[in-house]
């Protein structure tokens, strides 16, 4: 389970570590897209909109949990890189206690806020009932979502990106089968989509716990579960800025969804579908962020900052290169991709395809810029300077992404293309800020050398 990533070819380590990560993200996105694809075949636009809006809320919650767990990945990775196995075990034990409390609190709070949340995001009237049902069931499953993500973060901190891939593969297969059962056979609509998602996560957690019991690379003692202020400080010091950053990014996209919702049901469905497609295309940037965090943390822990910088360079090259290719391809295939998620033979479906194609053609350029600033964010996390990642994203959201989308929505009511371009412009601003921050860090020679 544990793997040393501080020796050998940096490029090879990046590729070999990121591929399972990439496949994990692919599978996770696939089962999220499966909900929309399957419900689009068996239900109408209202149900599709309910699932797309509800899944955006759940995606926001999930990425915040993943962001918080980044503190575990980096803390465990630095301990492993430094050869401190006892410290790694202590970090893991404190993580378990922390996220146990977080999952219970989130479940209780969000279940009491289902209706206010649905109202706050301006859900179209026809989709309100389905969205409430979807979110209620998914909120009940928060402990499973939390458990899966902290287990995966621990494995990745230990240098193992393959096991989490197997866990999510199990969840993906279960979700697709359950979706067809609940929506195709039993016709449960949004409730069926939520049940499939929740139960598949539970199955994945059972599988991951079974693997942990069989492997004993890191042995946990009772004392490891005793809360330690220093350990919690490290985990939360890295995780909280990333969690808030990811949460605010999702808030920005929910605001964009609200803006789209106010334009009508077809625009709302189009934006919801494109968000799912973009989440699929963002697999490479996302995997590079996590790869740079994990590899960078181990190398910084081992006192090899130059290898962390090399990791960043290769990640930027791979992610930005992918973004360029994806941007070119989407210009020729946008409507065809959107049509997979709705019935273009109906009047509403044809409108969704048209609007979705417009939005996707503009939005896709975000793949290039996100590939760059995601990689830098991973590097900043590895250096335990996750506050920089938080700041560049906040500036991009407040100064460019949300204002840009709002203005273009008002100026161009007949098309979604300018809204897509405005979203990409936010990431371009992030890239500029990241380059400036990285230059300052290099000049001041403060890379790494994080306090013990």
Model-based region annotation:
Residues 30-49, 118-125, 181-188, 247-280, ...:
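Helix-terminus/linker motif at the lipid-water interface of multi-pass membrane proteins
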Residues 22, 26, 30, 34, ...:
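Generic alpha-helical transmembrane segments of integral inner-membrane proteins
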Residues 48-108, 145-164, 271-334, 370-389:
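Small-residue-rich hydrophobic transmembrane alpha-helices
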Residues 12-73, 77, 240-260:
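Signature of the first transmembrane helix
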Residues 1-18, 76-141, 185-240, 296-365, ...:
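Short alpha-helical transmembrane segments in multi-pass integral membrane proteins
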């Amino acid at each position: 389970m544990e793997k040393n990533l501080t020796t050998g070819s940096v490029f090879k380590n990046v590729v070999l570590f990121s591929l399972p990560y990439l496949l994990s993200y692919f599978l996770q996105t696939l089962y999220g897209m499966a909900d929309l694809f399957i419900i689009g075949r068996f239900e109408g636009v209202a149900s599709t909109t309910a699932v797309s809006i509800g899944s955006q809320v759940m995606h926001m919650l999930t990425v915040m949990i993943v962001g918080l767990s980044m503190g575990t990945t980096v803390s465990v990775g630095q301990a492993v890189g430094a050869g401190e196995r006892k410290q790694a075990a202590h970090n893991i034990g404190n993580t378990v206690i922390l996220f146990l409390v977080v999952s219970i609190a989130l479940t209780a709070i969000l279940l009491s806020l289902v209706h206010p949340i649905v109202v706050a995001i301006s859900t179209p009237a026809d989709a309100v009932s389905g969205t409430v049902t979807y979110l209620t069931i998914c909120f009940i499953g928060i402990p499973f979502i939390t458990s899966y993500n902290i287990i995966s973060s621990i494995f990745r901190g230990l240098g193992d990106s393959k096991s989490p891939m197997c866990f999510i593969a199990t969840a993906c297969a279960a979700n697709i089968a359950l979706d067809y059962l609940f929506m195709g056979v039993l016709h449960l609509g949004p409730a069926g989509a939520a049940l499939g998602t929740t139960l598949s996560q539970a199955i994945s957690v059972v599988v991951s716990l079974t693997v942990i019991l069989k492997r004993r690379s890191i042995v946990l003692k009772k004392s490891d579960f005793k809360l330690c202020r220093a350990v919690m400080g490290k985990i939360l010091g890295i995780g909280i800025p990333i969690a808030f950053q990811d949460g605010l990014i999702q808030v920005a996209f929910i605001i964009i969804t609200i803006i789209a919702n106010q334009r009508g049901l077809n625009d709302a469905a189009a934006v919801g579908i494109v968000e799912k497609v973009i989440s699929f295309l963002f697999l490479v940037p996302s995997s590079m962020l996590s790869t740079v965090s994990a590899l960078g943390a181990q190398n910084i822990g081992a006192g090899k900052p130059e290898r962390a910088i090399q990791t960043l360079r290769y990640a930027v090259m791979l992610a930005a290169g992918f973004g360029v290719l994806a941007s070119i391809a989407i210009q020729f295939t946008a409507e065809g991709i959107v049509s997979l998620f709705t019935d273009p033979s109906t009047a509403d479906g044809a409108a969704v395809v048209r609007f979705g194609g417009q939005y996707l053609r503009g939005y896709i350029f975000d793949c290039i810029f996100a590939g760059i600033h995601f990689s830098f964010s991973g590097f900043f996390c590895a250096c335990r300077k996750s506050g920089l990642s938080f700041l560049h994203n906040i500036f991009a959201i407040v100064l460019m992404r949300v204002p840009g989308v709002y203005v273009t929505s008002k100026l161009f009511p007949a098309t979604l293309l300018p809204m897509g371009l405005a979203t990409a412009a936010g990431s371009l601003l992030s890239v500029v800020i990241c380059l400036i921050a990285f230059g300052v860090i290099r000049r001041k020679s403060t890379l790494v050398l994080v306090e013990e």
